[in-house]
């Protein structure tokens, strides 16, 4: 029985995908739910599994083809016949070991009675492109010694060999020149990232304001309770949970930063869906922690951990990345000291975290060493005034420098 492999439903507003790659070749056996083909959409990468056990008998859509939802990608022949045929000895060619006469000259023995070059001589010959036939060995049974190679170099063997090498390298210059460039088609995800970032720049009146935060209090709190926190909640206590809580706290006071423009209207969101930017091998994705303002610190950390794992494994669903109202990105994990993050349209704000660096700070009239981080808030100046943006960032700073405020809701 033959079963068709079809493009699954890819989520709201997604109607087509690009064939990324086939994991199986024609004639190969497949198991139930084993990934057959990878589909790339403008939001996620999806693996299509085999619905039955059998053998892949036909591939209709090739790599790079654009296919619509429910389109047939190929066929799998199910049943014992398909499996036994794919594993039968006659279907698999086993290469025979080469006979002694078919072995390459490099593996053949040296002429009878002749010793191979000494290791130091062989190394010197290889470095100077000198063949054994160009040198007469003075060692026992004609072995080439290091002194023989040095003597040949002094007599000009190197020069004649260099001419031959130069001629050979000139003939291969053209292929090498062609290999200096490579043209690769962008993936659907990369095309979407490029388009959305450029749209954000062209549409929003984007501006960035900066501040710095002393991370001493958060780092001390984390150091004291991280083991107990992980033991109780089953997840590590990171910095992102504190930042998410601080953002949710500040957004209550400044709802415009959590709003968006729709035509001539401003849409205020009475909830916080925090987008957490995650870097993957295929590009940046922003999964969403829904109703983060209603979550505890432990719940936020668990959800961030879950979404981050899905993102790195390429298993995020489209729904996992929809509906965000504010984004947090952490360039500090890559060593960034300061940046101007680009808005994730249609959102009106994005917070950029950066690397923590010890710096000399004046505190209470004294110079002390503090672990400092630069914060950057990019915002849409069309609806967020400068005073709101600056004060919003100050509130985030205050919450992080005094994390007890987050617990007491102050």
From Swiss-Prot:
Binds 1 lipoyl cofactor covalently. Residues 2-77 form the Lipoyl-binding domain. Residues 116-153 form the Peripheral subunit-binding (PSBD) domain. Residues 101-113 have a biased composition (Polar residues). Its cofactor is (R)-lipoate. GO terms for cellular component: cytosol; oxoglutarate dehydrogenase complex. Keywords: Acyltransferase, Lipoyl, Transferase, Tricarboxylic acid cycle. It catalyses: N(6)-[(R)-dihydrolipoyl]-L-lysyl-[protein] + succinyl-CoA = N(6)-[(R)-S(8)-succinyldihydrolipoyl]-L-lysyl-[protein] + CoA. Gene3D superfamilies: 2.40.50.100, Chloramphenicol acetyltransferase-like domain, E3-binding domain. Pathway: Amino-acid degradation; L-lysine degradation via saccharopine pathway; glutaryl-CoA from L-lysine: step 6/6. Its EC number is 2.3.1.61. It comes from the Bacteria. The modification N6-lipoyllysine is found at residue 43. GO terms for molecular function: dihydrolipoyllysine-residue succinyltransferase activity. Belongs to the 2-oxoacid dehydrogenase family. NCBIfam families: PRK05704.1, sucB. Forms a 24-polypeptide structural core with octahedral symmetry. Part of the 2-oxoglutarate dehydrogenase (OGDH) complex composed of E1 (2-oxoglutarate dehydrogenase), E2 (dihydrolipoamide succinyltransferase) and E3 (dihydrolipoamide dehydrogenase); the complex contains multiple copies of the three enzymatic components (E1, E2 and E3). PANTHER family: DIHYDROLIPOYLLYSINE-RESIDUE SUCCINYLTRANSFERASE COMPONENT OF 2-OXOGLUTARATE DEHYDROGENASE COMPLEX, MITOCHONDRIAL, DIHYDROLIPOYLLYSINE-RESIDUE SUCCINYLTRANSFERASE COMPONENT OF 2-OXOGLUTARATE DEHYDROGENASE COMPLEX, MITOCHONDRIAL-RELATED. E2 component of the 2-oxoglutarate dehydrogenase (OGDH) complex which catalyzes the second step in the conversion of 2-oxoglutarate to succinyl-CoA and CO(2). This is Dihydrolipoyllysine-residue succinyltransferase component of 2-oxoglutarate dehydrogenase complex. It comes from Bartonella quintana (strain Toulouse) (Rochalimaea quintana). The gene is sucB.
